[in-house]
Amino acid sequence: MNMTEYDQAIIALYEHPGNNCAKPSNIAGAMLKTSLTNVDRNTSFTVTWSLPDFSAQAVLSCSINAHAHETAVIINFERGAIKIPSPIFCPKEFIVQRHGQVMQEERKSYEYTGGGWHFQADEVARCLRDGKRESSLWGHDKSLLQMEIFDEVTLGLSILEHAIEIIVGSSSGRLFATLRS
């Protein structure tokens, strides 16, 4: 699974002031694997926050064999949308569209050299220089949450694959299984 689309969801939803950095209430996913290496080729997953004061959902997908759409990220809100063009790992602009009787659009563009990874390297260098063990921009909580989400998606899929193998090998034709939700 790719991490870049996850980053946008965390910035928009996990860090949203109304969420107060609460973990998602539900994670679901689907994956197609390559026949050659059995690694994920296409993965889609949904991360849902369903809290009394904050409800939001991220629908994410990544692929190693299909090109990204021109608009890599669309974040819809009640009063507008933020659109981030491809490539998702190195966007050089974003567009804010406000909904209303006359839709307003604001475009912000940035110029920099490289593929975008230097931002992470610069942050690591700043942390090392300052003696920090954790970045204030992307703390351990976000990395651990990412691992939990990815584990949940892959665990759910491996349980499903195992259940399918049992069905194929079953002589009684009946299977009762409980999948963790």
Whereabouts are the PLM-identified features?
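Active-site oxyanion/phosphate-handling segment shared across diverse enzymes
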Residues: S86-F89, I95-H99, W117
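C-terminal helix-rich "cap/oligomerization" subdomain common to oxidoreductases
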Residues: S50, E123-S181
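Soluble or luminal CAZymes and related metallo-dependent hydrolases
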Residues: N2, G116, K142
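Contiguous beta-strand/loop segments that form the cofactor/metal-binding neighborhood of enzyme cores
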Residues: N2-C90, V124-C127, D151, G169-L179
